[in-house]
């Protein structure tokens, strides 16, 4: 029989069952399971087991609620039409599926867990909140920073997803979702507010580590590369002349984008011992708030915009990029540093953007309180504008990462590159879920 769970997931399930049985005084069953699974108290001690006591019940109630929701949805005509919609063409629509409210100050950032239905949000009051976006419930409040939380990202070594946060308190903190979001490490080193953090995908040629690297950007005008397993800063990158607002790694982890108040977009080769500037892109007329690499799925559309006869191969990275600025525009760039298109439509600062996993669309949010969808197959035409979704500036936007399943077994929880091209093809499933955070203190979930 083929195995549904990964070895790690199976181990977690076994521990949860043992903890549940122990909590309900089924000692003979506990002893039998511990013996059968070779999980003696020296390996799985009672203190650790206590953390697993309620996990099985939580999972069970989640399944029951999901079953009820599925039954309710199946009776709704709109849900039937939604399920028929191709994920590759899905775009968010109002009203939001959930309006999540618990923050007391503006939300600065959001981040999706790569596998589970968890989402994190960070606010001006140094608070991080963890939610279940599937059910619209607050799971926990995480405290540790002393000033505003400016960015969040999930990632890390395969099989051990971490949450990284950065703050105006000059630090980066690493939290362990598998251990009640315990703060396992604090990374000091920046000399001013840390604006952005992103885990760097594994697979970069020549990279000494795999899945352990984290990039950060700061108002101290540096980008730093960290090893999350040791907490050491491996590289400090200098080149910008003002506050660096955002960073974005390429899919193979070889390149990094950075942008900020000096109005430039910089492309770095971070696979080298001393990172090199490959390109400096100039054109925005105000601070650049956000940047992103275009996924290979968008190359065919962007190549047409760039006037290329043939799209770059899907195996290549760093071919096209996007930036959003306080000058109210979005610019699309090619690998030569040429601005191939300027998208005009927002009436205020562009705060965040994300490419649709299908590559056909680009989504953006702004201080004009709108979410805009741009069709890259139509020369970047704005084909949808969502108004009235928030009551104040929209500060953040994230798309739930797709679920990637290997041919053999598991869902890939690692933020990183699919396996080498020689390997069997992977099954990539688009999750039609986005989240937005706002100065109105609410986190809103849009889904199919």
Swiss-Prot record:
Domain LisH: 9-41
Annotated Gene3D superfamilies: 1.20.960.30, YVTN repeat-like/Quinoprotein amine dehydrogenase
Protein family: Belongs to the WD repeat LIS1/nudF family.
Cellular-component GO terms for this entry: cytoplasm; microtubule; microtubule associated complex; spindle pole; transferase complex
Pfam families per the UniProt record, alphabetical: LisH_PAC1, WD40
Domain text: Dimerization mediated by the LisH domain may be required to activate dynein.
Name the UniProt record assigns to this protein: Nuclear distribution protein PAC1
Originating gene: PAC1
InterPro entries: Dynein_regulator_LIS1, G-protein_beta_WD-40_rep, LIS1_N, PAC1-like_LisH-like_dom, WD40/YVTN_repeat-like_dom_sf, WD40_repeat_CS, WD40_repeat_dom_sf, WD40_rpt
Source organism per UniProt: Fusarium vanettenii (strain ATCC MYA-4622 / CBS 123669 / FGSC 9596 / NRRL 45880 / 77-13-4)
GO biological process: cell division; establishment of mitotic spindle orientation; microtubule sliding
Transmembrane parts of this sequence: none
Keyword Transport: yes
Region (Disordered): 74-95
Any one GO MF annotation of this record: dynein complex binding
Entries under HAMAP family matching the protein: lis1
Compartment annotation: Cytoplasm, Cytoskeleton; Cytoplasm, Cytoskeleton, Spindle pole
Function: Positively regulates the activity of the minus-end directed microtubule motor protein dynein. May enhance dynein-mediated microtubule sliding by targeting dynein to the microtubule plus end. Required for nuclear migration during vegetative growth as well as development. Required for retrograde early endosome (EE) transport from the hyphal tip. Required for localization of dynein to the mitotic spindle poles. Recruits additional proteins to the dynein complex at SPBs.
Keyword tags: Cell cycle, Cell division, Coiled coil, Cytoplasm, Cytoskeleton, Microtubule, Mitosis, Repeat, Transport, WD repeat
